[in-house]
A protein has these predicted regions:
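Conserved glycine-rich cofactor-binding loop
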Residues: 16-17
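Alpha-helical segment proximal to the catalytic Tyr-Lys
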Residues: 126, 170-174
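C-terminal substrate-recognition "lid" of short-chain dehydrogenase/reductases
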Residues: 133, 211-239
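Residue(s) in the substrate-gating loop at a strand-loop-helix junction
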Residues: 141
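Substrate-binding pocket helix/loop in short-chain dehydrogenase/reductase
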Residues: 97-98, 105-110, 199, 203
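Short, small/polar-rich loop/turn modules that mediate ligand/substrate recognition or access, typified
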Residues: 173, 178, 232-234
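Active-site helix of classical SDR
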Residues: 121, 157, 165
Length: 244
């Protein structure tokens, strides 16, 4: 009987579309098994499962999970099992005056974008510490670096992601676990659906690269960071076409 070689597994949240889906496809091509999570887009995430298993020959599990709910996250961690790479990508946005924002919506943004990192990492990190290896990549935003008018909750959540990344990296470096983040500028995802074509054209004029970034480029940056030497940790890398 042949010996089955255990492949490494990547857990990706917000994996049904956008940056998460692009990262899943790219990691599958490099031979990682996948555990893909999204809140409700079951059809979309199962398409990625079928595609990656067929084209890359890897194992891909999927699960619906609201990462803002610690009870659901516990079930997710149990089902995921061994995780070697964790990509915290799930996020929501809110555009509007801070004074018009409801308390419920504030908590939704903070719980999804920031608190979810704590809920997930507190369950996944112990196994990484036992193995003395692991990689955590948090998807952040330039608004976490400088803040954005009309996006106070989103900016605050991503600023928290940046600090969470730097602090956890110091905590886990002795266990040879890398923790990094990418602060993306404008990437071509569903987060832009609220903007008109005219608004997007004006936004592009502000970006020296004269365009918005693609999810493929975002995934390439994520994978390059995941391949970086183990001494590379605690970094928040900005990728924004020279914008901010």
């Amino acid at each position: 009987m042949g010996v089955r070689i255990m492949r490494k597994k990547a857990l990706i949240t917000g994996a049904s579309r956008g940056i998460g889906a692009a990262a899943a496809r790219m990691l599958a091509k490099t031979g990682y098994d996948l555990f893909l999570v999204c809140k409700s887009s079951e059809e979309e995430i199962n398409i990625i499962k079928e595609e990656t298993e067929e084209t890359a020959g890897i194992s891909c599990q999927t699960m619906l999970c609201d990462v803002s709910d610690p009870v659901q996250v516990e079930l997710m961690a149990q089902k995921a099992g061994e995780v070697h790479i964790l990509i915290n990508n799930a996020a929501i946005s809110h555009i509007g005056l801070m004074t018009d924002m409801s308390l419920k919506r504030w908590h939704q943004v903070i719980d999804t974008n920031l608190n979810s990192l704590f809920y997930i990492c507190r369950l996944i990190v112990p196994q990484m510490v036992r193995r003395q290896s692991g990689k955590i990549l948090n998807v952040s935003s330039v608004w976490g670096n400088v803040g954005a008018s009309m996006e106070v909750a989103y900016s605050a959540s991503k600023g928290g992601v940046n600090s969470f990344t730097r602090a956890l990296a110091k905590e886990l470096a002795p266990s040879d676990i890398q923790v990094n983040a990418v602060a993306f500028g404008v990437i071509d995802t569903d987060m832009n659906v609220g903007f008109s074509k005219e608004e997007m054209d004006e936004l592009k004029k502000e970006i020296p690269a004269d365009r918005i970034g693609s999810t493929q480029e975002a995934a390439e940056m994520i994978c390059r960071i995941l391949e970086a030497p183990s001494y590379f940790t605690g970094q928040v890398i900005t990728m924004d076409g020279g914008w901010i």
